[in-house]
Every structure is written in structure tokens, then in C-alpha cells.
């Protein structure tokens, strides 16, 4: 069944199909993720809006049993600051890929669409893209069926303690219960505290965010452990971010 809809959408990626055609994956607000066929993409009027991380209102023909089609578009929004910075672009591409991985095709998820859009808008405004990515990662865990409590001890349920995390018990340990897991993570207590704050943060009121580089490195390492242990996905965009740690700093120094 094919139906016509008008929906805001974010282009996740495109890929070549035959000689001059393209398949374009768009996360739509009204109809979830869909694959759209664009014929003669190089000469098409749609060429400007089928690039990754372009946001627009689309007039679409949606097909539940096959490829869908883009009929028209308006109110195009791009992210020039994101696109002009390799590092920000890498993280923006990763959060979009993470949203893609967390959601089945054709499944509507307007809250996730809004959250992804707001994350990109805050990156565009210049807020710390690494921290925004951590916030996105911790929130989207529920889409993978994972719910973690960083607010209280798994054993005594006390709050406000210098928590560590235990993968054995799937939760936090207070100092009185560190001994329950000899292989606990030995985290800086600021890490569980921050993740607890991230879980309840409201992006609509977020104006600034700043963390020391050492804390950001610890957050990145722990989030990688969480995703490896509980989610088990290995995205190309995440591998690229990891490679930035090796050669990205050299690039930054050359551009000074």
C-alpha cells in the first residue's frame, strides 16, 4: 500500500544504485525510517536535500512493502558548522547511525526523532559535541532494551554515595558494598554521578555544558564498555571516531 504524507525528515545516508540513481535512507517524524528511491539523482531537483544530515519537510509517497519516493520538499535546514568541522561531523554522524541502529524500519518514533534533531541543533550551536554524544548514548540505551540505574546502590539502595559500577550486578555499588565485586570498574565517582544527571537532563533548557578533558576521556571509555557489554553493535561511524583519537590530534595541531 502506497500513501502520500508530508513529514519532517532527516537524511541518514545515501548510496549509489545503478548508474545514476540513489537509495536514500530518511528518518521521518511521521513514518519512521524509510528507504527512498531517487532516479537520476545527479540531475534531480532533489540533489541538494538527499545529502546526510539534511533536515527538511518532505512530501513523500510511502510504500510499506518496498521502496518509497520523494515527491517534493521545503523548509530545508542544514548544519554548516557541523559540516565544516571533521570532528563534530564524525560525532554527529555517529549519533545518527546510533538512532538508525536502535529503531526498526517503518517504525514511527517521533520522540526519538525530536531527540536526535535537538542533539544535532545543540552541536550546531557549539555545545560540547562529545558530551552531547554521551548524553544521547545513555538515553538511547532504552531503545536497545537496556535500563541502568546510576542513582542508588544495587544492594542497599542508598543514594548520594561515591558509586562504582559492577557489570556483574548490572548496577552501582556504594563504598560499603565494593567488596561484592572484585572486578568492579574502579570508576572515578564523578562518572556514575554524571551519567545519573545525563539520564534526566532536559535538552530544551540546556544552554551550556563543560567538562574537563580527563573526565570526558573516562566517560568515553566507560560508555564504550557499556555498549560492548549490553548492546554489542559495532558501527563504522564509531570506528571512525576511535581512529580520530589516533590521528585527529595531529590534524588539529597542523591546523593551528
Where are these regions (language model features)?
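Non-catalytic alpha-helical scaffolds and adjoining flexible linkers that form interface surfaces
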Residues: 1-256
Amino acid at each position: 500500500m502506497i500513501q502520500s504524507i508530508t513529514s519532517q525528515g532527516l537524511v541518514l545516508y545515501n548510496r549509489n544504485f545503478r548508474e545514476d540513481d540513489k537509495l536514500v535512507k530518511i528518518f521521518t517524524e511521521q513514518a519512521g525510517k524509510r528507504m527512498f528511491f531517487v532516479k537520476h539523482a545527479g540531475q534531480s531537483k532533489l540533489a541538494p536535500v538527499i545529502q546526510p544530515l539534511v533536515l527538511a519537510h518532505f512530501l513523500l509517497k510511502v510504500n510499506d512493502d518496498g521502496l518509497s519516493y520523494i515527491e517534493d520538499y521545503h523548509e530545508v535546514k542544514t548544519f554548516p558548522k557541523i559540516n565544516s568541522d571533521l570532528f563534530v561531523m564524525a560525532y554527529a554522524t555517529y549519533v545518527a547511525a546510533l538512532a538508525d541502529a536502535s529503531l526498526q524500519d517503518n517504525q514511527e518514533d517521533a520522540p526519538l526523532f525530536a531527540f536526535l534533531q535537538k542533539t544535532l541543533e545543540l552541536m550546531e550551536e557549539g555545545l560540547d559535541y562529545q558530551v552531547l554524544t554521551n548524553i544521547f548514548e545513555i538515553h538511547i540505551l532504552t531503545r536497545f532494551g537496556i535500563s541502568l540505574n546510576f542513582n542508588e546502590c544495587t544492594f542497599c539502595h542508598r543514594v548520594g554515595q561515591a558509586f562504582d559500577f559492577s557489570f556483574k550486578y548490572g548496577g552501582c555499588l556504594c563504598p560499603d558494598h565494593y567488596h561484592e565485586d572484585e572486578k568492579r570498574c574502579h570508576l572515578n565517582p564523578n562518572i556514575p554521578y554524571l551519567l545519573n544527571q545525563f539520564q534526566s537532563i532536559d535538552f530544551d533548557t540546556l544552554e551550556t555544558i563543560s567538562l574537563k578533558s580527563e573526565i570526558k576521556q573516562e566517560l568515553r571509555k566507560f560508555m564504550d564498555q557499556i555498549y560492548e557489554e549490553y548492546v554489542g553493535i559495532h558501527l563504522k561511524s564509531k570506528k571512525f571516531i576511535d581512529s580520530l583519537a589516533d590521528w585527529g590530534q595531529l590534524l588539529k595541531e597542523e591546523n593551528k
